[in-house]
């Protein structure tokens, strides 16, 4: 089910390619917010959780490698010794290594599905999406090879199945599966290759993960303490309750009849034997191709990029610091002044979110110039148009208590709030709002201001809601000036269907309008 794009003045309400699925996902994310809080919500920090699990896998794997015998004859006994001779150290660490790997695979799948449902795979996001596709293969291969090192019956089954699958390509000249026909066909050299792969592939995976987030400013690679400790506690509890153990030793003269598969990594083997090697290749190749083509299948319009005005850019670097996608660089100013810099926007990286315009110190509506031009601005919604729209909204309010709502087009439907006492100004992102506009609204007749942002840690442009909050609280430049009536300002985090929180904020302001006019308390966020 698709939703058509609509125009709200100069602000385009984004199309939602998977409307029903997106609504369900947002409800689940909101439910997790209530249970865990936004900062500890795993669904809002899947990338950070993936990095965290990767380092747990590396740390636990390093300990296991110290005690591991890399020979064919010594591999299985050494793993058994680690597991049973030191159950509360080696055995626990082995189980954590196993379950962290499973959790890593699960996080990759959920992260991919969530980003796809949210439509975050096309346009300026194409590189991040495409660079994530090889990570799926690297993670899967690393996990499969890790099972081989145990060299039990499950490892034998997985190794033979993998070689039979590769043999189906017919490009190796000789059968790889023949290396596993007799016990004598496996030697220490081949096993050393397995060890090399299990160490080398994660290194490539780490490199790929770095490339994956390379275009992001301040990427979310470290989960909040609550999420980190909670994840570690869950892994430890699971490891104690259901310790990871080995199957019987590998025996190439026999084929195991019953095995307990790890479905996170070894499910393709079962699928291959239920169908055929060719079928599995078609599924693998088709799935990879489909993922790689997703950016081309996106119908999202190309974002209009930010525009820099050299005459008004003073090289303050605020837009450079606040851009979520590293689309802004600083270069020498063309006027030739020593040390002067000019912001330069990369069209390929620009998301068209307007966060840079909200960061620009010249984006203030109090300027008395005839034509309001800022150092950096958005063509589809310039600051001058934003000021004119705010003035129009204030003039149309006729009630005793007058409130202005600044709303992000990716968040709640703030247009539904428009009434005789409530004006609405749409933004490309909450981060596009210069704090001076809040003070301007209050000084030109508004009794209260509500800033409606995306859910906390769920901003459509990653950092917009966060920067807005910090600007209003005076923690980030440009900040809301102290002389503004801060008690009359509310910032609300809300999803597309969440008008209740906005209504509560409006009702609270209506009830506190007299107090807001008198006092100068803190901004409510």
Please name every model-derived segment.
Residues 25, 31, 35-66, 78-97, ...:
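Membrane-embedded alpha-helical bundles of multi-pass integral membrane proteins
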Residues 1-18:
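Short, non-transmembrane cytosolic segments of multipass membrane proteins
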Residues 299-311, 366-385:
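Membrane-interfacial segments at transmembrane helix termini in multi-pass membrane proteins
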Residues 133, 147, 158-161, 231-234, ...:
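Iron-sulfur-associated redox domains of electron-transfer enzymes in respiratory
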Residues 98-103:
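Individual alpha-helical transmembrane segments in multi-pass integral membrane proteins
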Residues 311-314, 350:
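Short Cys/His-rich zinc-binding micro-motifs
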Residues 318-351, 355-379:
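Iron-sulfur cluster-binding cysteine motifs and their immediate structural context
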């Amino acid at each position: 089910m698709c939703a058509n794009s609509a125009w709200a003045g100069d602000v385009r309400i984004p199309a939602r390619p998977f409307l029903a699925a997106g609504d369900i996902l947002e409800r689940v994310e909101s439910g997790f917010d209530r249970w865990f809080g936004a900062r500890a919500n795993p669904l809002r920090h899947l990338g950070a959780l993936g990095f965290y699990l990767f380092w747990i896998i590396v740390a636990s794997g390093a300990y296991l490698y110290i005690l591991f015998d890399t020979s064919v004859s010594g591999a299985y006994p050494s793993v058994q010794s680690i597991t049973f001779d030191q159950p509360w150290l080696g055995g626990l660490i082995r189980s954590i290594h196993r379950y962290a790997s499973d959790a890593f695979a699960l996080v990759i799948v959920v992260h991919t599905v969530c980003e796809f449902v949210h439509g975050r795979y096309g346009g300026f996001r194409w590189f991040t999406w495409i660079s994530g596709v090889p990570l799926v293969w690297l993670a899967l291969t690393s996990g499969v090879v890790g099972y081989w090192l145990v060299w039990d019956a499950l490892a034998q089954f997985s190794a033979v199945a993998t070689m039979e699958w590769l043999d189906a390509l017919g490009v190796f000249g000789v059968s790889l599966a023949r290396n596993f026909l007799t016990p004598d066909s496996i030697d220490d050299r081949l096993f050393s290759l397995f060890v090399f792969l299990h160490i080398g592939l994660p290194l490539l995976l780490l490199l790929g993960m770095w490339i994956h987030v390379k275009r992001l400013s301040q990427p979310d690679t470290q989960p909040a303490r609550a999420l980190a400790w909670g994840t570690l506690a869950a892994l430890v509890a699971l490891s104690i309750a259901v310790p990871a153990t080995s199957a019987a030793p590998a025996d190439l003269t026999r084929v195991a009849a019953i095995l307990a598969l790890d479905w996170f990594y070894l499910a393709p083997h079962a699928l291959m034997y239920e169908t055929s090697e060719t079928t599995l290749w078609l599924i693998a190749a088709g799935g990879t191709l489909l993922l790689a083509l997703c950016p081309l299948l996106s119908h999202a319009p190309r974002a209009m990029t930010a525009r820099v005005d050299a005459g008004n850019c003073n090289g303050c670097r605020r837009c450079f610091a606040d851009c979520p996608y590293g689309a802004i660089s600083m270069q020498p100013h063309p006027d030739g002044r020593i040390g002067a810099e000019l912001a330069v926007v990369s069209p390929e990286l620009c998301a068209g979110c307007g966060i840079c315009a909200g960061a620009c110190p010249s984006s203030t509506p109090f300027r008395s110039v005839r034509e309001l031009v800022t150092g950096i601005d958005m063509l589809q919604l310039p600051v001058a148009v934003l000021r004119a729209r705010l003035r129009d909204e204030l003039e149309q309010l006729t009630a005793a208590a007058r409130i202005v709502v600044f709303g992000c087009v990716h968040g709640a439907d703030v247009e539904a709030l428009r009434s005789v006492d409530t004006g609405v100004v749409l933004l490309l992102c909450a981060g596009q709002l210069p704090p001076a506009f809040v003070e301007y609204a209050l000084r030109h007749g508004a009794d209260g201001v509500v800033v409606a942002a995306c859910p906390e840690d769920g901003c459509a442009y990653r950092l917009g809601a966060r920067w807005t909050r910090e600007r209003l609280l005076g923690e980030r430049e440009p900040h809301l000036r102290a002389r503004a009536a801060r008690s009359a300002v509310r910032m609300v985090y809300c999803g597309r269907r969440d008008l209740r929180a906005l209504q509560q904020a409006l009702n609270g302001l209506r009830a506190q309008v007299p107090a807001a006019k008198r006092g100068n308390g803190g901004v409510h966020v």
